[in-house]
């Protein structure tokens, strides 16, 4: 991974969880979620990422990885969340 990619991932993680922010909880520590694309669910590149806390990313029944349909209905599509994330970085 090149330095610009690492820097981008760091900045995204520093934003805090985008799902928590939509619920009114700001500055929740986040990890990186690579948005998936295509029928095979391939991970995207290191610039197509959104910040999610472990709860919303992978550990709860409300997480993207365990309940993607529920998560999408509640918070929006991965593409919509990516667009918001990129706006936050401006």
Where are these regions (language model features)?
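Short cysteine-rich loop/turn motifs with clustered Cys
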Residues: 2-31
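Divalent metal-coordination and catalytic microenvironments
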Residues: 12, 34, 53
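Cys/His-coordinated zinc-binding microdomains
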Residues: 21, 54-57
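The feature represents the first ordered module of a protein
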Residues: 22, 35, 40-42
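Short Cys/His-rich "knuckle" micro-motifs
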Residues: 27-35, 61-66
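Conserved catalytic motifs of the protein kinase core domain
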Residues: 28, 48-49
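Polybasic, low-complexity binding patches
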Residues: 39-48, 58-90
